[in-house]
């Protein structure tokens, strides 16, 4: 009997030790967000209506049909007049960018946000264990991570990763990478820098599918400080509950729907095809099939399955709408942080997921105020939620991002304390939400679509009065031709 009891106690001790070890490992693998800083350029970088018009007029490959297309697209883009452009574009050098322009653009974003991040948190650059930088369209040597390490004199054993080519979803790729690295490196600090190089990649041709990137993409970025130190959990803004990555690059159609190429005349740019919505929906559905069971209550999932099996009614809804039908996403999610990639993307995701205008407001306003800042866009959306004091302790935030490849990378954060920092929205928060996201382009330049105007009678004085600024006389010849 004593031998049996001894064996039993020994087994029990081993089992309890195992459980304790597993608990400590899981605790150390948590990913906490301590702070984030979004980039805000100076007033001289704003792309107002007139500045945008000047940039468009400088493109010698555009004629009247292209101007009409750009006017219509810009007016309905959901982008306002307060967005920011790269310095070389503002200065009129978009057709001949150089390496110095590219480095200056990303340096300003990276160092500006990192300086503020270190100052806010009190964390020293020498304490950083992991550094991940994601810039899709610019990859110099030495790498951008090396530039940061050199600037801040970081440790020689820092784990540095430079991500390129991941598109608008790159920030979520970086966050997921850090979470995986936290499983190996204990009590670590990690920084993720998410931005894009816009200036050197400005399209100067006339392909409409490639001109879209000029209308949508703007300067911006964000630096985020993360840790797996359990002792700092009380200081965290939020905790990462789960992250799911989906890549459908094996599908040729999906691979080519969002791609960097040269047009027929040799002008480099970023092509967005009509297959993009279909590929995005496919990747998103596959992602949700893995993610939703992780975040929604079992009761909600069972009810959805029962409703789907009992329903025999056929509808014309999209595959995404059909999947979300019957699911109450708000049973496991309070906030929806949709990447502000474009008005159509926000509209479609909001409709398919059954979201209200309140739910999609942060993404709409981020797009209106800052434009599509690529991988940094999600953080401007998150900043809006925080500035509007929406985020309360225990709330869960669903971050949704789509990127070239084609891929969908989503995650769910849990807010660990009430958040109300006005952050990058401080100077303009009282103006939002705006009543209308229509761009004033149509009001000022609607005459371009006026069929009653005799194109051949247009002269320089008449056109300058319409535009409100002087221009190259050859623009008149391009319009007439």
PLM regions: where:
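Terminal signal-anchor or tail-anchor transmembrane helices
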Residues: 1-28
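Membrane-lumen (extracellular) interface motif
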Residues: 1-8, 122-125, 392
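Hydrophobic pocket-lining "lid/loop/helix" segments that shape and contact the acyl-thioester
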Residues: 27-54, 58, 62-77, 81-88, ...
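Short beta-strand segments
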Residues: 34-35, 134, 164, 191-196, ...
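Short acidic, glycine/serine/threonine-rich loops at helix termini
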Residues: 45-46, 142-146, 173-176, 201-207, ...
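Conserved catalytic cysteine-centered active-site region
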Residues: 77, 81-84, 104, 135-189, ...
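Short glycine-rich or small-residue beta-strand-to-loop segments that form or flank ligand, phosphate
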Residues: 128-136, 162, 336-337, 399
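Catalytic phosphate/nucleotide-handling subdomain of diverse soluble enzymes
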Residues: 380-400, 405-430
